[in-house]
Amino acid sequence: MPTNTGVIVKQTSAEAIPLKAQLEVAVVGTCTTGTLAASTPTRIRTKEDATTILGAGGATDTLPKAVALLQRYGCGNLIVIKGATADEAGTLAAIPLLANDRTQLGITPQVVLCPSFNSTAIVAALNTIVDNIRAIALIDITAATSVNDALTARDADDGVGIKDNRIVVCFPHMQNTDDPTKLEELSVHLAGILANLANYGQSPLNQPLKGVNGTDVTMSLSYSSETSDNEKLNDKGVLTVNRNPDGKYVIWGGRNSSYSEGLTDVLTFINAIRARDEITRLVEARSIKFLSQESNFATASLLRESFIDCLSEEAAKRAIKQGYKATFNESKSDYNAGKLDYTIEFAPWLPIELITASVSISVSVER
């Protein structure tokens, strides 16, 4: 019989993080390796998909790098698309093709990225597509830009200076833990963080970044000083970073590019825009079921109850707050014309609970 006692330790290879984060994230960029066809939205669900479809990636390819980073966060519902040419012109031409995702892939992205590209033309194209599909676009201020130059760029009204609820501007680039010379776009980290939030109504504020240990430019970081670089950037509508007491980097700021210092508009919050989009999708789906019904008060009341039920389900998930309302506007409706008019109101969860503001959606159901 064996007489040895003690502890036996065996070394095994580490298992990859399961790709369970299902937020629909679309990445537009360049790729010169793999099997990815140009101008064709393509789904990536697994590590194997990424290896086959994207290959190892060329020196200036943006898609393989971005997908690898998103998969670090467990993202398993990615859409990639490249243009006919591996440059800005090709990328610019590919962005509008995201409108085809619903018909070609059966899904519509909720977050759109275009890593390494942030010209005025690129941002304008992103702005158009996210308005069209009800999503948000994440862009980065160019690597190695100083904090002062980043603040100056935000004063413009184009490119990274655009003021829009659906555009999120990120700064700085992050240094990879294993190779500090390898810079990673903060926007891609943010997309991974959004994919891992409990629901669309949660803010990314203070969520940790994975696999980074520095910024590409020197920055002063603080939770309390109004003169720190991260606070100056946040006041200009830039999503940036901070360091928690453990020294780990976290997202700092949950606002989009339409924010400016002191503004209390609820729609400057990323999660407020995402909540409005999600509730709109749910309301549309329920409204469609009533299109074939006779237009009268009974139908109007049933549809209102359906809206209330929808909001109740989302509040139970803590995606939105309690206190939601669905109002049938009989004075704006026309039974003879088959038109029913409603107002939907709800409040998202805000990082600053002193701001109590609701989001309103106007619904017109017409047969």
What residue spans do the PLM features occupy?
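Hydrophobic alpha-helical bundle architecture
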Residues: 290-298
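Short loop/turn motifs at secondary-structure junctions
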Residues: 74, 106-108, 320
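C-terminal structured domain segments
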Residues: 298-345
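C-terminal edge-of-domain segments
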Residues: 330-367
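N-terminal assembly/attachment segments of tailed bacteriophage virion structural proteins
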Residues: 39-86
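Short, intrinsically disordered N-terminal pre-domain segments
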Residues: 1-24, 364-367
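Phosphate/oxyanion-binding active-site loops and adjacent basic polyanion-contact surfaces
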Residues: 87-91, 299
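A glycine- and small-residue-enriched flexible loop/hinge signal that marks low-structured segments
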Residues: 9, 19, 26-31, 36-38, ...
